[in-house]
Amino acid sequence: VVYGQYERPGSTSVQFLKIDISPAAAAMGGSYYSIASGATALYYNPAAIASMEKRFDVVFNKTSWFADIDHDYSAIAYNYGRYGSFGLLLTRLITDEMKVRTPMQPDGTGETFFAGSYRLGFGYAKKMTDRVNFGGTINYIFISLFRDFKQEAATIELSADYDVGVRGMRFSMKIGNFGSSVKFVNEIYEMPTNFSFGLSGLILESENNYLLGSSSINKPNDGPPIGLIGLEYGLNKMIFLRGGYNLGHSTATWSAGAGVKFNVSNQLISADISFSDYSSLGIVNRIGLNLHF
C-alpha cells in the first residue's frame, strides 16, 4: 500500500520533458544535477549558469529516441557578470512523416502528418555569494498532433546550487516542470512535476587525472523516487569516460559514454556521445556538441 501511493502512471502529460537532453548527463545515468554547467545546465540546474567560466556557452544535442523519433536540444547561455547569467533553450521532439489511416482506408488516405512537442524557455541565474547560486527558467510548451489538435502550457523551474568548497563537492536541488495542465479530448493531465537533489565530488585527483562521482534522487509526481549514480574519469582535461546506473526506474538500467574537449583558435569545443539501455525497449544513443567562448 505504501509503495502503491507513488504509482500514478498515465496521470501526467508532456512526457518528453523527462528525457535527458545531454549525452554527458545520460552517460552518467542522468545524475547530472550537481555537475551541469553552461547551456546544458538550463535543463538540469539553471542556477549553475551563474558559475560559467566563459562569457558564452552554446550547445547542440541530438537523441535518437524510440520508433524513429528525434529529440533535440539547443541552448545558449550568456554570463553578464554582476548582472547575472541569461539563457535561451529549445527542446523538440518530433516524429517522422506518418500516413493518415482510417477504418475505411487502412492503407492511407493520401494525407500525411507529423506529431511534435516543443519547449521554449528563458533562464536567469545569479550568484548570491561566492558559493551559492539561485536560478530558474520560464517555459512555453506547445504540442501539435494531427490537424487541429494543438495545446499550449507554461511551466517554471527553480533551482539552487551550493559549492561546498571541499574536493570539488557540489550540492543542488531543483523543482522542475511546475505549471499548467494540458487537456487531451475530455481529460485533463498535470505536468510531470519533479523534485531533484544531487551531490557530486572528486573521488580521486592527481595532476593529470580525476575521478568524479555523482548521486542524485529524482521524485516525479507520477511515480516512485528514482536513484541515479554516475562516474566520470577525466584525462588531461581532454578525454572523458563516463558510466552510470538507474535505480528504481521501470526500464532504464546502465549507461556509458565518452567525450573529448579541444581548443581551436582559443575557443573550447566539446563533443560527447552516450548509450543508454532501456531493457526490452533497446539502446538509445545521444550525440552533442558544446562551444565555450
What are the residue ranges of the model-derived segments?
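Subset of outer-membrane beta-barrel
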Residues: 3-293
